[in-house]
């Protein structure tokens, strides 16, 4: 959940 570029879970 750092940028919106890569699909990262905000957990």
Swiss-Prot record:
From which domain of life does this come? Answer: Eukaryota
Compartment annotation: Secreted
Keyword list (alphabetical) reads: Amidation, Neuropeptide, Secreted
Q: Name one GO biological process term.
A: neuropeptide signaling pathway
**Which Gene Ontology terms of cellular component type are present?**
extracellular region
Against InterPro entries, the record matches this protein to: Periviscerokinin
Please list which residues make up the signal peptide. none
Tell me where in this chain the PTM Valine amide is found: 11
| Family of the protein in this entry | Belongs to the periviscerokinin family.
Task: Give the protein's biological function.
Answer: Mediates visceral muscle contractile activity (myotropic activity).
Name this protein carries in UniProt: Periviscerokinin-3
**Which organism does this record belong to?**
Cryptocercus darwini (Brown-hooded cockroach)
Q: What is the lineage of its organism?
A: Eukaryota, Metazoa, Ecdysozoa, Arthropoda, Hexapoda
């Amino acid at each position: 959940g750092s940028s919106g570029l890569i699909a990262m879970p905000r957990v």
